[in-house]
Amino acid sequence: MLGWIKRLIRMVFQQVGVSMQSVLWSRKPYGSSRSIVRKIGTNLSLIQCPRVQFQINSHATEWSPSHPGEDAVASFADVGWVAKEEGECSARLRTEVRSRPPLQDDLLFFEKAPSRQISLPDFSQEEPQLKTPALANEEALQKICALENELAALRAQIAKIVTQQEQQNLTAGDLDSTTFGTIPPHPLPPPPPPPPPPLGLHQSISAVDLIKERREKRANAGKTLVKNSPKKPEMPNMLEILKDMNSVKLRSVKRSEQDVKPKPVDATDPAALIAEALKKKFAYRYRSDSQDEVEKGVPKSESEATSERVLFGPHMLKPTGKMKALIENVSDS
């Protein structure tokens, strides 16, 4: 049975023109030889069916007399026409039927633009009408008047607070002055606050004036305290002291011979002991310096004076021989 099926398949492939080896072993993932069906389809001589073409015609030219009735090209308008012809058992194109004159209802239907039917309610009609500008202006004026009244009340409260604070300060000062005297039997009640002014404008002016008066009083009180308090000694300014340093001239003072001579050294002075030890340690440097002075022709008196004056210096350093090597290298180069 299997052998018979293989022979049948080979015969079919031979008639088509495809070899069995190429079908089984070719793995081409693209092109006309990708599958057996494609190979069979390419080798068979099949006639392709003609494609259906549709033409969209406008509604204005559909019923016009100038439109040719012998147009054999089908369009989407034929679909609607066929749907309307429900009584006929067979469907016919519009070109096969005699054209009838258009009715007025049809013309009105085609002339009207397609409109969308909305099932939702129209809320725009239910909205209340807008208020007139006169009513809006009246409401704005009422709000402004209310704000002005609130501002006037706030200014009156500020004026009351300021006056109460001033009265408290005055009563506190009177109590401080009378503490050293007799104590009154009963404290006097504070005076009632003054009535608020009638208009908001006068209220604002009075509050501002009270604030200014308080500031002036504070400033005057500070000035009097500064005047009455004793002045502190001012710190000297170093810039003013050092301003004339460049113009200062020093005069030369001649010293006496007693001042030039070295003072006798105390044996118990630690500084003298350290100086003697350093002299002994760095004596070679002192000798080299004295030899240089002799070579330069310095008189003995000056060399002795310098040796007596200069106790410490580079002549006390210990020679290492590095300076001589450097000097020789420089002289050779």
Curated annotation (Swiss-Prot):
Residues 286-315 are annotated as: Disordered. It is found in: Mitochondrion. Its main location: mitochondrion. Residues 286-307 have a biased composition (Basic and acidic residues). The keyword Oxidoreductase does not apply. Keywords: Mitochondrion, Phosphoprotein, Transit peptide. The keyword DNA repair does not apply. GO terms for biological process: aerobic respiration; mitochondrial fission; mitochondrion organization. Transmembrane segments: none annotated. May play a role in mitochondrial aerobic respiration. May also regulate mitochondrial organization and fission. Belongs to the MTFR1 family. This is Mitochondrial fission regulator 1. It comes from Pongo abelii (Sumatran orangutan). The gene is MTFR1.
